[in-house]
From Swiss-Prot:
This is Small ribosomal subunit protein mS23. GO terms for molecular function: structural constituent of ribosome. Component of the mitochondrial small ribosomal subunit (mt-SSU). InterPro entries: Ribosomal_mS23_fun (IPR016939). One of its GO terms (cellular component) is mitochondrial small ribosomal subunit. The keyword Ribonucleoprotein applies. The keyword Ribosomal protein applies. Transmembrane segments: none annotated. The lineage of its organism: Eukaryota, Fungi, Dikarya, Ascomycota, Saccharomycotina. It comes from Candida albicans (strain SC5314 / ATCC MYA-2876). The gene is RSM25. CDD domains: At1g26750 (cd23701).
Amino acid sequence: MKIQTDAANVLQRASAQLKSGLLKEKPLWYDIIAKYPPTSTNDLIKKSHVYEGKSDPRNNSIIYKYPNSNNKNNNVLFKTRPSNKELKSKNHNIHKLPKLKFIEDSLRKIFYQQHPWELSRPKNLIDNGNGNNNEKCDWSHMLQLHKPLDGESVVQRTLWLLKNNTTKGLTMVEAYDKARFEFYKLRMSEEMESHVAKEESTMYGSVFTSTTVNWNLSKEQEYINDWTIIAKERTQVIEANMNKSSAPIGSVVEEEKSQSSLFEDLLSNDNLQSEPEVEQSGQQQQQEQPKQETN
């Protein structure tokens, strides 16, 4: 982008217009701009910093000597690399959005790492419109009317203890432990109430059907049983096909099949020798029959 010089040359243009008569009166800002002129265009260009002297020991080997001069003062050191201080001061992440960090996130991370099975409990995501669902909650106590008991209750209770406990200064760990033990007591009481209610209902003759999870598992087991029968049939077919030799002639499988005992070889040779004798005797009988007919 081209550097704009109109604002920097405003004093020169106003002076030229006053001399030429385009401006009848001197502007009110003329004397102020003349006393404190704006920065020139040369000041807008960043210049490299030059060290004078031998303050930087890294540049001792980089010395430029003017020709035909024996004066030591003519030696000038030039900076060739940024210093560690300048490297640290560089803001490389100037265009990167900063990551927002909240205490609630760290508390949630710690709680669910210590209690992973709390994540398996079903939750209802309810939004009242304004995005703040904790307005009706009073975190001076753990149990709430408009919110079920979960890990978020521990987080909000811990923050309330840190802000409102003025009598005794609690640390983060102490407030978290206090909220966590309150959560344990309420969770155990809920489980005891559910067990007692189930025992009372069974005592009065109520029958509990299978849950949705058990029903899904039973349906899945039915399909598995059907597929076991099909798998057995298919494996039998595959094994039967594997027993059939599909090896080419002359292979090891064919040689093993062609191997026979000595007794089997002798029997086969005797059969081959007896077959031509039977054929010859049959031909002689056929020749004798027409001779008898002629006689």
